[in-house]
Regions:
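Formylglycine-dependent sulfatase
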Residues: 2-4, 21-318
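Bacterial N-terminal signal peptides
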Residues: 7-17
């Protein structure tokens, strides 16, 4: 799935190959999907990002630098990768269409593993984050967990945000809470539990773990914000509308403007731009810590030599 045109996507695959993996017919597979992740990682040369766990694992595997998505929208990008079919083929260009409406006999990646004797499990955001597109019983050995999370208490921690209304409240949050307060920490804990369960089973497994950060809102425990000096966060050099580009190229973007602290006209101040970028990096470091937990559990269970680990972002953020 490669495009010859520029796309707003970053895909990072890390695959750990060992002799024991290559010598076996059915190694385990751990697939980690990270929502809205661009190449803001040390292993991709980002001088700001603090991502020691992913960077360490990348040194043991393969980092792809030319992997592109088919469309820079969550649902079509994820479904295109998981089916091996273009968005135009599965006729999914939005967040609400199920790919089986156009291709009922399509075989997804987890479905393929399931059909060959694997335990196929899903925790977090994999196919999509809610509604019909996130449901596909054919792909999984048991129902997905935490695939559709709408509870504000799992998205926010500060009381001023919990008192708000609607799904979108503040666009970022730095709170003195543990990693386990937000949904991604819960997904990591549940994934670790399921890893132990799968390790005790004689069948190989395909475990898909989907983290929601660094997707908006940029909410992460304060300790990850504190890893960065706010004044050192770079903001875009050019914030104006590109000359001769169509209006729809930059307007309207409800993804960001739907949050309560973002002007409806989309005019972001330099201070707010720096805050948002700070929050994005904090979320990346938060996810790096959770990925580190998963890898540590693989090692503790002595599964790392017989497990292929794949980590990717569905598309980037700009």
């Amino acid at each position: 799935m490669f495009l010859s045109r520029l796309v707003i996507l970053f895909l990072f695959f890390e695959v750990a190959f060992y002799p024991s993996v290559l010598g076996q017919v059915k190694p385990n597979v751990l697939m980690i999907a990270v929502d809205d992740l661009r190449p803001a990682l040390g292993c991709y040369g980002d001088q700001t990002a603090i991502t020691p766990n992913i960077d360490r694992w990348a040194k043991r595997g393969i980092v792809l630098e030319r992997a592109y998505c088919q469309q820079a929208v969550c649902c079509p990008s994820r479904l295109s990768m998981l089916t091996g079919l273009r968005p135009d083929t599965i006729r999914v260009w939005d967040l609400n269409t199920h790919f089986r409406e156009a291709k009922p006999n399509a075989v997804t990646l987890p479905q393929y593993f399931k059909n060959t004797g694997y335990q196929s499990r899903s925790i977090g955001k994999i196919l999509h984050g809610g509604g019909a597109p996130s449901k596909d019983p054919e792909s999984w050995s048991s129902p997905p967990m935490y695939d559709n999370v709408r509870d504000p208490k799992l998205r926010y921690a500060l009381q001023k945000n919990l008192n708000g209304k609607g799904l979108k409240r503040a666009a970022s949050e730095s709170a003195e809470v543990s990693d386990d307060h937000y949904i991604d920490g819960i997904v990591a804990n549940e994934s670790i539990r399921v890893l132990g369960e799968l390790a005790a089973n004689k069948n190989p497994f395909f475990l898909a773990v989907g983290f929601r950060k660094p997707h908006l809102p940029f909410n992460a425990p304060k300790k990850y914000w504190d890893l960065y000096e706010k004044e050192e966060i770079q903001i875009p050099k050019h914030g104006s509308h590109p000359v001769n580009s169509p209006d729809w190229a930059t307007r309207s973007w409800s993804e960001l403007e739907g949050y309560t602290d973002i002007p409806v006209d989309g005019k972001i101040t330099k201070a707010k731009a720096r805050e948002l970028r700070h929050g994005y990096y904090a979320c990346v470091s938060y996810i790096d810590e959770l990925v580190g937990r998963l890898i540590a559990e693989l090692e503790r269970l002595k599964l790392e030599d017989n497990t292929i680990v794949l980590l990717y972002g569905d598309h980037g953020f700009h």
